[in-house]
Amino acid sequence: PHAPFNAPKKYWDLYDRASLPPLNPARPSGAPDLAFHDSRELLGLPPDRVEFTAEQVAEIRHGYFANISYLDAQLGKLLDALKRSGRLDNTIILFVGDHGYHLGEHQLWAKNSNFELDARVPLLIAPPECRQAGGRTASLVELIDLFPTLVDLCALPEPPGLEGVSLVPVLGDTAQSVKTAAFTQAPRPAYFDREPGGQPTAMGVSVRTAELRSTQWRDWASGQVLARELYDHQQQPEELVNRIDDPQWARARMQAETLLEAQFPRPSLGAK
């Protein structure tokens, strides 16, 4: 959900504000400035920019949880209506978010980063007679996989040129994985379309594997890499330390950056 977090009171009452999961607002150690943005979606811009008090942060986070429960209730109404219509057993249900959200973590608010909290989204797929009902999977997924999945579930011919892959194998066996990497991008400035010139100055391209997240920040005009990030998702999924200069991660970094170069080719500059 987006701000304003204005769910009805009964959804706020589901949560004890003091018992919500703790917030770690620290920036990841060693992360470049390009990894961050001005959080204007919630904080605004000068001269009207604000800084939240601790009480306001707690209220906003409480409101986010309330909005999620409100959203869940609306989804329940939709499913009840499908059941009453007699169409539930002939309907593919797919619930997805278009981006994640920061609530003060990493000193960020709202979206527009390549961190996991923005890149990871909820995804529920419930075809009729799903054999893995209620199952969860660690399989990497991209939103470009949704259309091929629906085509597959409907037994339709797959159009040529699709970038995504069907997730049907995962629906049959949640231990399966259909891809080894998922990619995201985030521009800088985050709202470049509202800046003079209407173009970004840099683009962050990121790859997530089962083990790590690797991000390159590239000059928009030349493609030259301006900054790099590498986060260990096995031991620290919160992305709190940039491991880019850690020699123990040198091989993994090289492999991840090979994936990035293949997915997001750069001009031949000679510069790395």
Region spans (language model):
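Core domains of carbohydrate- and sulfate-ester-processing enzymes
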Residues: P4-F52
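Histidine-centered active-site microenvironments of extracellular/periplasmic hydrolases
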Residues: P4-K10, L14, A81-E142, Y191-F192, ...
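A short beta-strand-to-alpha-helix junction
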Residues: P32-D33, A58-Y70, R87, S113-V121, ...
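Long, internal low-complexity/basic segments
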Residues: E41-E59, N67, L71, A190, ...
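Beta-strand elements within well-structured catalytic alpha/beta cores of enzymes
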Residues: Y64-L71, L75-L78, I92-G97, L123-I125, ...
